[in-house]
Swiss-Prot record:
Signal peptide positions (record): none
Record-linked InterPro entries: MukB, MukB/SMC, MukB_hinge, MukB_hinge_sf, MukB_N_dom, P-loop_NTPase
PANTHER family for this protein: CHROMOSOME PARTITION PROTEIN MUKB (PTHR42963), DUF4476 DOMAIN-CONTAINING PROTEIN (PTHR42963:SF1)
Keyword DNA-binding annotated: yes
Protein name as it appears in the record: Chromosome partition protein MukB
Residues annotated as transmembrane: none
Subunit annotation: Homodimerization via its hinge domain. Binds to DNA via its C-terminal region. Interacts, and probably forms a ternary complex, with MukE and MukF via its C-terminal region. The complex formation is stimulated by calcium or magnesium. Interacts with tubulin-related protein FtsZ.
Keywords: ATP-binding, Cell cycle, Cell division, Chromosome partition, Coiled coil, Cytoplasm, DNA condensation, DNA-binding, Nucleotide-binding
Domain notes: The hinge domain, which separates the large intramolecular coiled coil regions, allows the homodimerization, forming a V-shaped homodimer.
GO molecular function annotation: ATP binding; DNA binding
Protein species of origin: Yersinia pseudotuberculosis serotype O:1b (strain IP 31758)
Length: 1485
């Protein structure tokens, strides 16, 4: 027997009070004991979170919150966690003894919403010795640990060999793996399945009878029969599609004639207009080409005239340009003459100002000498006046000193003081610190010698200064002349500059004398140069007309060549006429041949269209009539072969359909009579009992039961005996087996298994040997597998049958087409292509026309060459006499050379004219400039310095003399002598003072006189300088104006300018007469051009009109062609035989088709509107749009499941082939798809009966359950009365309601809903659709009512309601219901899970104190019998004797809260012991 999987342990990491705690779970009951707040609910919440990590469902409320709608904001999970990473894991060992750790990582999310982030994961292959806490935490110290994050956990697990870590982003994937491994009992595919599972866990956790589960017991206990519902839905969908296809076939059959008529008339309507427009476009193109040829020829003629006009206009323009140039030159010559006259007048002014300037220069020099002498006298007078003033002041100071000496002592003291002052003054003045009264006499001699030397030097300088004053005025005059001539030069370079100027003076005079001869030579060369330029212009014009560049020496040879060319051209023109006549005759013959072939082309094109259609249908290249007849014989043979093969496929298909119908019987009965017999005998078909057998076991059981696998299992054979009397409607062999259908097994036979076979001992003397069938049919899975194969084979045969039927019809129609072709087109179909011959002839005609045009062009070109050659000869006659002038290449250089020499001579003449007088004056003064112009000033400065030196020497000598004279004052022995001497000295001083004052007065008077005279001289000098500067500035302005005028101002310039003006006037008159002559010729040429242009404008107008028509037609035609090609209708519309009909015939054909189309589309609004728009003759593309719309309309009417083409024309052909065959097949298919109402009733009843039996088996497990006064619990299953009536009517009275089930407008579901409403008119169905109601009626669960009943005391069986039971009884009853649901889920999921997996069973019960000891013992017994685990949360006063009990105590130590846990094993039959089961891991920092 398969061992059931168990939860080994629950691990909490970093929960509130649990840092790292693992609870080992008992195989039966695990009790969490502790006071309020000890952590029991937290532990259960961790378990539930690991089991169902869905935040939309989790809500951990207190029992006091039961019935509350909101509860705490975080739904009880956020507050149970601590900050950081938290884990809740379940350690599971399944039936395969595989250890799996499933769990979640939880983490609080910061914010006011108190959210929690959950990540589920699994660990597979973890060794048994490793505890979950060792994986989830990491030891930091001896009593400290750290919680690993999820990535760290993944790294640690993946580092272990053979251990797999998997993280889930989807809860569905997480639960899918848990289901496959046997952790949960039911596959949770959706959120609704998770909600059911959570409601079950929640009801278990909080105890009592959950209204959420009791109200939905059908959803919890009864499995959904999705296969039956899907079969009904598929059947209805197939019937709906079948009916829609049949309806489409009927509509298509009715529209087939409309298809033919519409496509035929639309093709005639649009193709006729299409080809008419194509023909008109070709005609317009031909007309446009003819007009273009005429236009081009007229343009060529006009171009010739225009060329002549351009040539004359060019010559006129040249003459006009030359006239303009001559007028400009004439005006320039007149202006030049005026300028020469102005320059002559300007030169006269310059000469007059130069003479005035020379006179002013002389006067200025004289006055400068006078002012210089006055300045010197002024300086002498100022010096004498200053010396007189100093002498008077000194004498006055000496006299005042002597007058103050009133007595001897005072006088001695004064004298002594004066002696000391004189000594100090002498020391300072002589700069002799060592001077004393004793050595003063010696120094006096030295300074007397210095004074004498200074005086002699002064006399020498006075002598030199007098000489320099005489030469100073001449130097200034010569220097001013140099500056006037050469510009600003330094005084030191004046002599050298003057020498150079005088040296260049003779050469400048020589150049000035050559001006007149050079001007005459230049005039002669310029005249020849102008003649050469005129000749070059004529040569350039000649080369331009000839189109080649010729050298002057080549002109004579060219003249001879042009004369010979004229002779040749005159001969070639005469031969052109005969050749033109021959080409025109050939052109007429080609036109006649083309007309004949054009009449044959339509018949041949019609035959080719028919032949191409036959080639497309046959896939053969039919090249002659023999191949056509041979292919007809092949068609007859192919039709016979295909018909035989089709009949064979139809027989095979019927055999497979019969086998499918036999295998599709409900309950696996190959004979429908067995189902009725089973109901009559009250038994069950053996195939129905083994309906769930797997496909792997099907061969064994099929061989085991042999022929009896179609037997009926009855509870008692004796009760069946009476029914066998007179039994006629049954198979030939009917097997009856006695046994309980609910617990039937194969123990009734003695079996020996062999390889791929069994030996069954039916009796002691009777054995049966049966081999495993190659295709087992026992069990639903085997039948479905076989049916799938048969369905595929049937579809293949149906497809092949359809293909063969289509081929037969197609072959028949192809044979008929070949017969029509032979009768109508065989005679002309294989003739040569007339259109190809027409194209060749048209090509030849185009060649001849082009050759004719080329001939005309060549002839015209030769005439032009003839005229051009004659014109060239006349031009050469003018050019040849000028060849020598053209070959003179040095003429321009010589003109340029003479021009440069003349410019130099004129420049020299202007120089001599301007500076000749100054050079004449400068020549005798050249020697004066040799001395440095600055020496006079330096001499004056030396003289002043010498005067100062002499004065200083005198003062020094006077000071020393005074010291020597006062040497006696340094002694004080003789006072009287000193007084006498003092009195004499005083008198002398007074006399000298009087003389000095008189001298001072005379010096002042003389200084005033000289100052007045000097002022007068300076004013005169300033006046002269001002006049000189004004005259000089005016002379510079006049000279600059003369330079700006830019013409020579000599005597012959005016005569030359006047001669040049007269010459240009004569040339201008000659040019004007030639221009008038050209204007007259141009007028005649323009008259001829006007006549040509009028003709050309008419041709252009006609050509542009027809070209505009062609262009507009081309734009529309391009749109039409693009539309035609994009939609693939070119082959239908481009009917070449219509190209040979004229426009009236095509228009008549289109109008007839239009009338028929108006009637055909009268009922179709869209096509009617498109047809109305297409009638616009200016918009041919609208007819194409109508044709496309018709095609699209017909294409939309084609069902692709019926006809294998998108082309309506081909669809019409295929339609006739397919419609009849499809109608027959679909009608038969509808009869096979239809299901009888009795079969539906039997299926639903069988399903209800099976589920009732299953629930009765579940009830047997709850009969011994008792809680308090409740002695037993059971589940009642009843069929609703209204639904039971519906089943009876479906099985017994279906003939009365065939109007519903035989209606093609109602599906089976809708008919079932209508029948239900008819049977229950009092029920309000609301706004629900019949289809929805019918689908609900096909679900057997809606036929059943489920109620939970309890047997309680004297009341007997009562409905289980919380109000009628105590709390403990309600908890126990609810637990019983939950156990039943879990069992139901396990059975329902058995086929989805591996055979070797028995899932874990575990429920919860919080606050179990409401149960008494007996009820708890009942729970223990229930868990033991059902191999179920239970986790109970109980207060401290409960001490169960079985299972495992954990004592939880919440403690606070140093602000750290943790739960102390002690675990105890049960001690009912053992010695009590209190060791802890799991060591407590102290909470880490």
């Amino acid at each position: 027997m398969i061992e059931r999987g168990k939860f080994r342990s629950l691990t909490l990491v970093n929960w509130n009070g649990f840092f790292a705690r693992t609870f080992d779970l008992d195989e039966l009951v695990t009790t969490l004991s502790g006071g309020n707040g000890a952590g029991k609910s937290t532990t259960m919440a961790a378990f539930v979170t690991a089991l169902i990590p869905d935040l939309t469902l989790l809500h951990f409320r207190n029992t006091t919150e039961a019935g509350a709608t909101s509860g705490s904001r975080d739904k009880g999970l956020h507050g149970k966690l601590r900050a950081g990473v938290c884990y809740s894991t379940l350690d599971v060992v399944n039936s395969r003894h595989q250890r799996v750790v499933v769990g979640v990582r939880l983490q609080q999310v910061a914010g006011r919403d108190r959210k929690v982030d959950i990540k589920p994961f699994t660990i597979q292959g973890l060794p048994t010795a490793i505890q979950p806490t060792e994986i989830l935490t990491e030891l930091v110290a001896e009593r400290q640990a750290r919680v690993l994050s999820l990535p760290e956990l993944k790294e640690r697990v993946e580092a272990m060999e053979g251990v797999q870590f998997k993280q889930f982003n989807s809860i569905t994937d997480y639960h899918s793996l848990m289901f496959d491994l046997g952790v949960i009992p039911k596959r949770l595919r959706s959120s609704a399945d998770r909600s059911k599972f959570y409601r079950l866990i929640e009801a278990s956790l909080y105890g009592g009878i959950s209204s959420a589960i009791t109200r939905s017991l059908r959803d919890y206990l009864l499995p959904e029969n999705s296969g039956v519902r899907k079969a009904f839905q598929d059947m209805e969908a197939a019937l709906r599609e079948n009916r829609m296809t049949l309806e489409a076939i009927r509509v298509t059959q009715s529209d087939r004639d409309l298809f033919k008529h519409l496509i035929s008339e639309a093709t005639s309507y649009v193709a006729a207009d299409y080809m008419r427009h194509a023909n008109e476009r070709r005609i317009h193109l031909d007309s446009a080409l003819v007009l273009r040829r005429d236009l081009f020829s007229s343009r060529k003629q006009l171009v010739t005239e225009q060329y002549r006009h351009v040539e004359m206009s060019r010559e006129l323009a040249e003459q006009s340009g030359a006239e303009s140039d001559l007028e400009t030159d004439y005006q320039a010559a007149s202006d030049h003459l005026n300028l020469v006259q102005t320059a002559m007048r300007q030169q006269e002014k310059i000469e007059r100002y130069q003479s005035d300037l020379e006179e002013l220069t002389y006067r200025l020099e004289e006055q400068s000498e006078v002012v210089s002498e006055a300045s010197e006298q002024q300086a002498d007078n100022e010096a004498r006046a200053e010396a007189a003033e100093l002498e008077v002041d000194e004498l006055k100071s000496q006299l005042a000193d002597y007058q103050q000496a009133l007595d001897v002592q005072q006088t001695r003291a004064i004298q002594y003081q004066q002696a000391l002052q004189a000594l100090e003054r002498a020391r300072a003045l002589c700069q002799l610190p060592e001077l004393t009264a004793d050595n003063a006499e010696e120094w006096l001699e030295t300074f007397h010698a210095k004074e004498q030397e200074a005086t002699e030097s002064l006399l020498q300088l006075e002598q030199k200064l007098s000489v320099a004053d005489a030469a100073h005025s001449q130097f200034e005059q010569a220097y001013q002349l140099v500056v006037n001539i050469a510009g600003e030069v330094s005084r030191s370079e004046a002599w050298q500059t003057a020498r150079e100027l005088l040296r260049d003076w003779p050469s400048q005079q020589h150049l000035a004398e050559r001006v007149q001869p050079l001007r005459m030579r230049l005039s002669e060369l310029e005249q020849r140069l102008r003649a050469q330029q005129d000749a070059e212009r004529l040569l350039q014009e000649f080369c331009k007309r000839q189109g080649n560049a010729y050298q002057p020496e080549e002109l004579e040879a060219l003249q001879r060549e042009l004369e010979s060319q004229v002779e040749e051209l005159s001969l070639s023109v005469s031969d052109a006429g005969e050749r033109r006549m021959a080409m025109r005759q050939e052109l007429e013959q080609l036109k006649l041949k083309i007309q004949e072939l054009t009449a044959r082309a339509p018949v041949w094109l019609a035959a080719q269209d028919a032949l191409s259609q036959l080639s497309e249908q046959s896939g053969e290249a039919l090249e002659d009539s023999r191949q056509v007849t041979e292919y007809m014989q092949q068609l007859l043979e192919r039709e016979r072969e295909t018909t035989v093969e089709r009949d064979e496929i139809a027989a095979s298909k019927r055999a497979i359909e019969a086998q499918i119908e036999r295998l599709s019987q409900p309950s696996g009965a190959e004979d429908a009579r067995l189902i009725a017999l089973a109901e009559r005998f009250g038994g069950v078909l053996l195939s129905e009992i083994y309906d769930d057998v797997t496909i792997d076991d099907a061969p064994y059981f099929s061989a085991l039961y042999g022929p009896s696998r179609h037997g009926i299992v009855v509870p008692d054979l004796s009760l069946v005996r009476e029914h066998l009397q007179g039994l006629d409607d049954c198979p030939e062999d009917l097997y009856l087996i006695e046994g309980d259908p609910q617990s039937f097994d194969d123990s009734v036979f003695a079996v020996e298994e062999h390889e791929k076979a069994v030996v069954v001992k039916i009796a002691d003397r009777q054995w049966r040997y049966s081999r495993y069938p190659e295709v087992p049919l026992f069990g639903r899975a085997a039948r479905e597998n076989r049916l799938e194969t048969l369905y595929q084979e049937r579809d293949r045969l149906a497809e092949r049958y359809a293909t063969l039927s289509f081929d037969v019809q197609k072959t028949q129609r192809t044979h008929q087409a070949f017969s029509r072709f032979i009768g109508s087109h065989l005679a002309v179909a294989f003739d040569a292509d007339p259109e190809a011959e027409i194209r060749l002839l048209n090509t030849r005609r185009g060649e001849i026309e082009r050759a004719l045009n080329a001939h005309e062009d060549q002839n015209q070109q030769q005439r032009q060459q003839f005229d051009q050659a004659k014109e060239g000869i006349s031009a050469l006659n003018r050019l040849i006499p000028l060849v020598s002038l053209l070959l003179d290449e040095t003429l321009a250089d010589r003109v340029e050379e003479i021009t440069e020499e003349l410019a130099e001579a004129q420049e020299a003449a202007r120089y001599i004219q301007q500076h000749g007088v100054s050079l004449t004056k400068l020549e005798p003064l050249l020697s004066v400039l040799q001395s440095d112009p600055q020496q006079h000033e330096q001499l004056q400065e030396s003289y002043v310095l010498a005067q100062n030196s002499q004065r200083l020497a005198k003062q020094q000598a006077f000071a020393l003399t005074e010291v020597v004279q006062r040497r006696a004052h340094f002694s004080y022995t003789d006072s009287a002598g000193m007084l006498t001497e003092n009195s004499d000295l005083n008198d002398k001083l007074r006399q000298r003072l009087e003389q000095a004052e008189a001298e001072r007065t005379r010096a002042r008077e003389q200084l005033r006189q000289y100052q007045s005279q000097f002022t007068q001289y300076s004013q005169v000098l300033a006046s002269l300088k001002s006049s000189y500067d004004a005259k000089r500035d005016m002379l510079k302005e006049l000279s600059q104006e003369l330079v700006d005028i830019g013409v020579p101002a000599d005597a012959n310039a005016e005569a030359r300018a006047r001669a040049r003006r007269d010459e240009l006037h004569a040339a201008l008159s000659t040019n004007r007469s030639r221009r008038n002559q050209l204007e007259k010729q141009l007028t005649f040429c323009e008259a001829e051009m006007d006549s040509l242009q009028k003709k050309l404008r008419k041709l252009e107008r006609d050509y542009h009109q027809i070209r505009e028509q062609v262009v507009n037609a081309k734009a529309g035609w391009c749109a039409v062609m693009r539309m035609v090609k994009d939609n693939g209708v070119e082959r239908r519309l481009h009917r070449r035989e219509l190209a040979y009909m004229d426009g009236d015939e095509l228009r008549s054909m289109s109008d007839k088709a239009l009338g028929a189309l108006r009637l055909a589309v009268a009922d179709n609004e869209h096509l009617r509107d498109v047809l109305r728009l297409s009638e616009d003759p200016k918009r041919p593309e609208r007819k194409i749009q109508f044709y496309i719309a018709v095609y699209q309309h017909l294409r939309e009417r084609i069902r692709q499941d019926i006809i294998r083409t998108d082309d309506p024309v081909e669809a019409i052909e295929q339609m006739e082939i397919e419609l009849g065959r499809l109608t027959e097949e679909l009608t038969a298919r509808e009869q096979k798809l239809a299901i009888s109402s009795k079969s539906v009733s039997n299926i639903i009843r069988k399903t209800i009966h099976r589920e009732q039996n299953r629930i009765r088996m579940l009830n047997q497990g709850l009969q011994a359950v008792s809680f308090g006064q409740v002695k037993s619990v059971r589940l009642n299953v009843n069929v609703r009365e209204a639904h039971a009536t519906l089943l009876d009517v479906l099985s017994e009275q279906q003939e009365q309601h065939q109007d519903l089930f035989n209606s093609n407008r109602l599906t089976f579901s809708e008919a079932l809903a209508k029948l239900y409403q008819r049977l229950n008119p009092q029920m309000d169905m609301g706004q629900r659709l019949p289809q929805t109601i019918g689908e609900e009626l096909l679900d057997y669960r809606n036929y059943l009512e489920l109620e939970v009943e309890v047997y309680r005391g004297a009341d007997g069986w009562l409905r289980a309601e919380s109000g009628a039971l105590s709390t403990g009884e309600a908890i126990g009853t609810g637990m019983s219901i939950l156990v039943m649901v879990v069992q139901s889920w396990e059975e329902e999921s058995r086929r989805l899970r591996g055979k070797d997996i028995s899932p874990c069973r575990l429920l919860f019960l919080d606050e179990a104190a409401r149960l008494d000891a007996k009820s708890i013992a009942t729970l223990f017994e229930l868990c033991e019998r059902l191999e179920m685990q239970l986790i109970i949360a109980a207060p401290e006063n409960i001490s169960p004797e079985k299972g495992t009990t954990y004592k939880l105590v919440r403690k606070v130590f140093q602000n750290h809260e943790h739960v102390h846990v002690v675990g105890l094993r049960g001690f009912a039959n053992e010695i009590p012991s209190l060791p802890p089961i799991a060591a407590e891991l102290q909470q880490g920092g």
